[in-house]
Amino acid sequence: MTKFDIETAIRSGDYEGVQQHFRGHINEEFTNDGLNLLELLFCYSGNESSRLRIAQLLIDEGITINHLTRGKSSALHFLLGSAKANWTADPEYLLSGVKLLIQAGADVNLRDVHGGTPLSYAIAML
């Protein structure tokens, strides 16, 4: 397994690929911004139901739910912020993702380097 394999599977929302290539390095960081697997997962769209399954797998494996990137963004920031910036997101997918992250302990009050909270990104999507 290479770091590229798991990163590619995460980016494409490939649940089976994640299962195949995941080797227990749950809090490994990717990209120059220091994204963990959960943050990387929510930077991309497509395969939404698979993405939610991957998120649950990562949570079950013990990923740090409130990990912050170098820009102080969390997975919840990425789920809501990327949806506005990069694609037209399905509201049901976003709601399911938000519920999943909050139930896993995501802090809704974390502020990124711009002072934004996940809620401020959610409001901006409307």
Language model regions located:
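Ankyrin repeat domain, specifically the short helix-to-loop turn at the C-terminus of the second helix
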Residues: 19-27, 54-64, 96-107
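Short secondary-structure capping/turn segments at boundaries of alpha-helices and beta-strands
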Residues: 25-27, 44, 91
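Generic beta-strand or strand-like secondary-structure segments
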Residues: 53, 57, 75-78
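Ankyrin-repeat boundary/"N-cap" motif
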Residues: 2-6, 29-44, 68-85, 111-126
